[in-house]
Every structure is written in C-alpha cells, then in structure tokens.
Amino acid sequence: MQKLVKTWLKRSKRIRGVLLQFSKELFFEFNERGCQRSAAALTYMTLFALVPLMTVTYTMFSAIPAFDGVGDQLNGLIFHHFLPETGEEVSQYLSDFSSQARRLSGVGVVMLLVTAYLMLRNIETTFNSIWGVKQARSGLSGYLLYWAILSVGPILVAAAFLLSTYLLSVQIMLEDLDGLGVMQLVYRVVPWALTSAAFTLLFVAVPNCRVPFKFGAIGGVITAFAFEVVKAVFGYIVANSSFKLIYGAFAVVPLFLLWVNLLWTIILGGAVFVRTLAEHSYASRISRLSDMIVVLICLALFREKAALGESVSDRDCVRLGIGLVHWQRMRSLMVEHRWIAVTESGDYVLSRDLRRANIWEVASMVRMPVSEELSSLRENIAGRAPWFADFLERQSELRSHAESAFSVSLESLFAAEHEEEKPLTDQT
C-alpha cells in the first residue's frame, strides 16, 4: 500500500511538472506571437466585415427555398447566445445595416465581398503566424477555402440551427415522459458539441500547414469550454454592472467591442494551445538537436524520395521524430533558400542538385558555425573587453577550418552513409 502511495505521488508530481511546463510555454507562445495585438486587430476588422458576412449569409439563405426565413431566426439565435445582455440591440443594428447592404449597387456588393475576403485573409495570416508559416495560400487553394467559408459555412450553420430547433421541439413533446431529463441534457450538449466542431475546423483548416486533427479536436473542445465559461462570466458582469447607467444607450458599443476582443483572444489562445500540444506530442530526442542536423536529416529523406520519383509530405518529416513546429520552421527556411519546392498538392520536392551543394551551404543557411555580425562589434567591444580581438581571430580560424571540412557535397555525405551500411547488411 505504501509503495502504491509513493508511486502515485511520484506520478502526480510528474504530471504537475508537465502541466506547469506546458502552461509556461503556452503563455510564452501567446505573448511571443503577439496574439493580444492580433486579437485587437481582428476586432477592428470584424467591425467592418461582420455586416458583409451577414449579407452573404442572407444571400445564401435566400437562394435556397428550404431555408427561407431561416436567416432572421438564425441571426436572433446567435446573438441571443452571443451577447446575453446587449445581443438584442446589436442584432437589430446589424440586421438594419445588412438590409441596407442588400440594396447596394454592383460596386457596393464587390466592396462588401472584398471586405469579407480581407477579414478571412487576415485570420489566415494570424493563424499562419502562430504556426510559424510564412507562405499564405495563393491562387486556387486560397480562393476555394474562402469561398467554402462564405458559401458552405452559412448552410452548415443553418443545419445546426434546424437540428437545435428539432431537439427543442422533441424536448417539449417528451417533457412529461422524460423523467431522467435526457433530452434536456442532449439539448444542452448539442450546441456545445457544434461549437467544438466549429473551433476544430477553424484550427485544422485555416493554417496553411498540416495540423493533426486529433490535436485540433482537443483544442476545439477546450476552446468551446473556455468560450462557455467566459460567456457566462461576461453575461453575469454585464447584468450586474453599471455600464448602462454610465453610458446609457451607447453602452452596447463598448460592450460589443469588449466581447469581440475576448472572443478573438479565446480563439487565438486555442490555436496556440493546439500548436503547443502538437509540438509536445511530437517532441523527441531528435527534435532537440540543432537546426543543422534536422535539415540534414530532412534532406537525406528528400534525396531518397527523389530517387523514387516521390514527393515528401509534412507527415513524412514528422515521422522522423522531428517536432512539428521545428520542422515547419526548417521547412520555411529551406523553401526560402530554394532547397525544396512546394507542389500543387501541398507536398514538397527537392529543388537542388545535392552533388553541387555542400554541407557548408547548409551550415551558412542555419547560421551554425559563427556569426559574422560579431565582427562589426569589434570597435564597440574591444575597448571594454581586451580579449575580444583574440576571440575574433580564433573564431575566424574555426570558420576557415569548418568551411574546409564542410566542403564535401551532400550527395557524397549521404552516399557514404549507405556505403557504410552495406557491410553490416552483408554480415547479417
């Protein structure tokens, strides 16, 4: 029994340590990626894009006879849950604006669509920044994603609304027969599950990189839970505060801005959570090696795949044991320096002849040996640190030796690796 207790204490201590370290990394990444500033920027963009998005939604509903009138009902339902205390006033304002927008000319409609597109583009850029992706979607893939959000999104939301309405009607009809309150529980769980699914799709589909669905789903559930908690707390504060006493009818404006900012903060926090979770899950001993070793391991894989006429996916590199975020950072670097190229399917192929590329080029790309920027500091540091000049000389010698040692081509390096493996194979 005592041994069991000790084992449990050790395990709980280890779990607490992991959770503490994870929380520290989560808050660090949230601040490092400037998520709070991004939330403020997206709040500002939302003010301009919300009416265009609603206009597109109404247009989609009007084009489908089965959903006739659903737009207004859906609008009321969303804002009832969206902002408990001021949702009715905000909903009325936005509905009026959207009704006026539907009477715009062709040029006005184009401007509304451009505004909605820019918001979606800004959201993708923010998510790419969180995942360390520098290259946004371009061409057909980006257009299809945004069009899917603007066209299919409202239909899915309408389907969710109809499902919720159906469950509510079933709950009312079976109220006397449902002694255990099962339908009431289902009616409460389904909207939360749909919210979780929406966040999951947002985390998985928006970034221009492969996000494991498992971690996206976990992040979606956690984010939906945080959303419900913050919504309840916000509603309680609004209901028991003196905002309306101070601002009067104008109180809806600061409250709406505050809520939108909180909403984007929760969403971006969820995206950072998914990224941090994925990095922790894929982390291994190899991911703690230097950038240069990781690049060489990846280039060796690209060489093998190129010999077979195949491309390399994100999953292929992650399976090597490299951290997901570490790989994405090195991938962006290799694409930027044209070591690899992106295919139309989103995979990657080798774009350089490894017989004409040497190890030193890789070392220079990842800034592995020494930094030439230190030489520019000679005058500033030498006066305060007499040893700095001697250090620069030794550093220069190290660089020359490293450059000479790394002059071998990458093809020779990888070919030598296979030659060393052959005797071992013959012996077996």
Curated annotation (Swiss-Prot):
Its main location: membrane. It comes from the Bacteria. The keyword Cell inner membrane applies. The chain crosses the membrane at residues 47-67, 104-124, 143-163, 189-209, 218-238, 248-268, 292-312. It is found in: Cell inner membrane. It holds the Pfam family Virul_fac_BrkB. GO terms for cellular component: plasma membrane. Keywords: Cell inner membrane, Cell membrane, Membrane, Transmembrane, Transmembrane helix. PANTHER family: INNER MEMBRANE PROTEIN YHJD, UPF0761 MEMBRANE PROTEIN YIHY. Belongs to the UPF0761 family. HAMAP family: UPF0761. This is UPF0761 membrane protein TERTU_3006.
